[in-house]
Amino acid sequence: METGDSAVKSSQDVHYYGKSTAQKHRRSNGIILIFRALTFSFSLTSVIVMGTNRHRIDAQSRVAWYDFDPFRYVLAVNAIICIYSFVEIWLAVYTYLKDTLFLPETFQVWFDYGHDQGFAYLLFSANSAGIAMAQLLQSGNSLIHGAYRCSDAGVFCTQARASIGLGFGAFLFLALSSLLTGLRVARWYFS
């Protein structure tokens, strides 16, 4: 009797594509873990690149990332995303290894989705402000310390753009994570 019951149960669990619900959840959790790790890597690299962006223009003048508010915004938001992604990686590893959520399902599903959405918008906003400032500096419409062009500051503008580009990479993977957590919300809500 037990073997018959388990055969019926396993045939009900298998979807017509041949994957069980548990296998699909495990694969989904693995993909989310990869996206979280990529978000963390890109945001951490962006923080490092922007945080080390200091150059000497001449004997008396130096330019640094903290001289420009948009670049401060880029660094601060990428640091926040880095910390958030680290926590989410820990939660994703826990979920992947234990096959269960760390927090109650209702809370964790909405926590992940809401924070992914909010932080993705924040990250996009910061990078957009940063790229606008970098473009103004590069075009010469705004001068460094009111007197110097980007060409006078070595690789300062290029390094700022690289950091912002890495921030957009973090945004891409955070947006993909948000898409998957949104699907998780829909699956939870309609099941």
UniProtKB/Swiss-Prot annotation:
Keywords: Cell membrane, Membrane, Transmembrane, Transmembrane helix
UniProt GO cellular component terms: plasma membrane
Subcellular location: Cell membrane
Positions in the Cytoplasmic compartment: 1-29, 94-116, 184-191
Annotated membrane topology: Multi-pass membrane protein
Protein's recorded name: CASP-like protein 4C3
Entry superkingdom: Eukaryota
InterPro entries: CASP/CASPL, CASP_dom
Membrane-spanning ranges: 30-50, 73-93, 117-137, 163-183
Subunit structure: Homodimer and heterodimers.
Organism: Physcomitrium patens (Spreading-leaved earth moss)
Extracellular-facing ranges: 51-72, 138-162
Family, as annotated: Belongs to the Casparian strip membrane proteins (CASP) family.
